[in-house]
């Protein structure tokens, strides 16, 4: 896979281009008198070291860019790498099937679970079909239908959060966007099964929170979680989206800061260069965390689980 490099990664991109060029020359002419292998290896080591240096000092705005990276793994990618026997379920049984939300029954190391997550899409047609990962009310009602099914059959619920926010269109508002989100918040707080939520990319406002009320809330290292996008915040406070980097720093949208505030439980480390650089490794780390969380929650009685979730919600805002 050819990598897309962000602006702050351009020094890495230049090194990778040199590596690709030398590798291509070496393959095209095996009769070259000079050995390029040592030079290629030297450049690769230099690229790794440079990547470590750049990623060791990322700001909140750079993390926000990584959270939106077009090659970042989405919900369906993690389903493919982590779960088996996935059977997708569709529709809210009231209006339509919103493709911005995917969900269904699968097995996690043999254990039946219900998976629900946002899905953005890769190519233009798929992005449009999935509305860029911005669900309408029917998407959240589909999610709730699947959660209630999981509750009836005593299956743990695993959600993957990755959305700029709930869709703000006129049609969505007419069909009750705010009601759908609010109902999910209420109902998720009373479900009798373990709920594990993970922010895998963008965690945008109520659109993220609508499938984010859980017993465990995790974030990938280079994901974000906020009430508004940095650009939106900058447009309100400074009347200019150009101030987005400043807004990102002020808002505290990155995983380590949110863990300090006790809004999330775990920051899951990503491979060097972010999740899209090594999806299998990222999926393995995420799977290990999900299994650990399930093990922690499965031993709780229904009453203890609900009391713990209630206390978690009541403690928000207290550091």
From Swiss-Prot:
The record ties this protein, via InterPro entries, to: Acetyl_CoA_COase_a_su, ClpP/crotonase-like_dom_sf, COA_CT_C
Keyword Transferase listed? The answer is yes
Does this UniProt record's set of keywords contain Lipid metabolism? yes
What are the recorded GO MF terms, alphabetically? Answer: acetyl-CoA carboxylase activity; ATP binding; carboxyl- or carbamoyltransferase activity
Q: Which UniProt keywords apply?
A: ATP-binding, Cytoplasm, Fatty acid biosynthesis, Fatty acid metabolism, Lipid biosynthesis, Lipid metabolism, Nucleotide-binding, Transferase
Enumerate the catalysed reactions. N(6)-carboxybiotinyl-L-lysyl-[protein] + acetyl-CoA = N(6)-biotinyl-L-lysyl-[protein] + malonyl-CoA
Q: Known SUPFAM superfamilies for this protein?
A: ClpP/crotonase
Report the NCBIfam families cross-referenced here.
accA (TIGR00513), AccA_sub (NF041504), PRK05724.1 (NF004344)
Query: Per its database record, what is this protein's job?
Result: Component of the acetyl coenzyme A carboxylase (ACC) complex. First, biotin carboxylase catalyzes the carboxylation of biotin on its carrier protein (BCCP) and then the CO(2) group is transferred by the carboxyltransferase to acetyl-CoA to form malonyl-CoA.
HAMAP family the record matches: AcetylCoA_CT_alpha
**What protein name does the entry list?**
Acetyl-coenzyme A carboxylase carboxyl transferase subunit alpha
Organism listed in the record: Pectobacterium atrosepticum (strain SCRI 1043 / ATCC BAA-672)
In the UniProt record, the gene name given for this protein reads: accA
